[in-house]
Amino acid sequence: MDSCCNFSLGTKTVLAKDSFKNVENKFLGEKIKGSVLKPFSSDLSSKKFRNRKLRPGVAYAIATSKNAKEALKNQPSMFERRRADPKNVAAIILGGGDGAKLFPLTKRAATPAVPVGGCYRMIDIPMSNCINSCINKIFVLTQFNSASLNRHLARTYFGNGINFGDGFVEVLAATQTPGEAGKKWFQGTADAVRKFLWVFEDAKNRNIENIIILSGDHLYRMNYMDFVQHHVDSKADITLSCAPVDESRASEYGLVNIDRSGRVVHFSEKPTGIDLKSMQTDTTMHGLSHQEAAKSPYIASMGVYCFKTEALLKLLTWRYPSSNDFGSEIIPAAIKDHNVQGYIYRDYWEDIGTIKSFYEANIALVEEHPKFEFYDQNTPFYTSPRFLPPTKTEKCRIVNSVISHGCFLGECSIQRSIIGERSRLDYGVELQDTLMLGADSYQTESEIASLLAEGNVPIGIGRDTKIRKCIIDKNAKIGKNVVIMNKDDVKEADRPEEGFYIRSGITVVVEKATIKDGTVI
């Protein structure tokens, strides 16, 4: 009889000696190899096989080189790997924080609306990652200074050629409802999600099995479906995306300990001192080389989470209804009685939610071989189409810099800098290690001449101005013969009346500020 019986639960498999040699099969993702040297009949007569004790009443199956492929092919469906379906995944992007760490860039804009990389906004990072991962059900939660963020989302993702199929992008703004509890704004990341759990009761969202929760202030390129697949494979209730980090930055993040099975066994939010040392781990067991492990002995939570929808609903409404933050409250508590898994992400990832990290990540883009770049044909980053002309330059010296569209550059020098859209640099300007966020509109030649004649300062940078290690926010007006170099290496300073702040030694010229002719900072 040529056919082979199917293996069922309770069935024991007897492997005939040498029967799998020269045969390659896949069973539960593993490969079995060998070569047939003896006929099956000799195996049945072998002393070892005859002396094997078989339990009476239990069906045994014999897998040989002749029936192995068919037998393994006909396994029950419970042994097959379940593929995660992006149609059953929704993304929640958190964009409602007050942005205190990015102040003054967030003085008039939500953190996800802050420009990055010359022509993008921070929100474009998770949005583009979702689109490239085929996740087309996206919710954006907003609260503080959301006008520019809402405007950018509308211009970029609502009907501008980006096809969401049967998906959507919904902006969920913080609202107040009747009653004492309803008067409160979002109290944290978990509280923000809790207030909108009702959206998953809608008919169009009832098939959502997993929810990924994303931050709006990170710089990285990630296929979220690989992350969700790991979540499904490990049968996790919650999965944390994690990145190895060195000791100098470890205390800035929530740190985790992960056992060899991938389960998160301990979570500590931004530990210091002895608590920080206790979170040190051998990262070689998570795929790092000994050299990499010595450099990065900590595992940080990226603030990217995947929840089973059912688990998220229960945690936020029943188990921990008064907990407001995922990182410091929900996740540490859930580790005790839920399957919380860790997903090690080895590619570039940077939290750019502070002035220092934001500045350094942007300036790093101008390196000859940057660790991260926006240029990728297969996974592009999307942003609002501005329909701007190419940049015009006149006898400029430009070294290792990024120049966005629609700029006018006089006879100037630009080194290791990023110039945002519609920027204007006059003759003799020298920029070094500077991030210029650009302008929202142009001023005509006659308008500029009129302003200069009246002793006023037009948008852009005036003649013979020298700037180093600076962030220039949108629509700033910097006069001629200005020097911004922070020669005294001041680390922190607030000069709002003069139009600038200093954070971590980086000078930040605020949006629409006017720096008068001859000013020295």
Curated annotation (Swiss-Prot):
A Pfam family hit:
LbH_GLGC
PROSITE patterns associated with the record: ADP_GLC_PYROPHOSPH_1, ADP_GLC_PYROPHOSPH_2, ADP_GLC_PYROPHOSPH_3
Task: Please state the pathway this protein functions in, per its UniProt record.
Answer: Glycan biosynthesis; starch biosynthesis
Which GO cellular component terms, listed alphabetically, does the Swiss-Prot or TrEMBL entry include?
Answer: chloroplast
Q: Name one GO molecular function term.
A: glucose-1-phosphate adenylyltransferase activity
Catalytic reaction list:
alpha-D-glucose 1-phosphate + ATP + H(+) = ADP-alpha-D-glucose + diphosphate
Q: Where in the cell is it found?
A: Plastid, Chloroplast
Give the family, as the similarity comment puts it: Belongs to the bacterial/plant glucose-1-phosphate adenylyltransferase family.
**Which named protein is this?**
Glucose-1-phosphate adenylyltransferase large subunit 3, chloroplastic
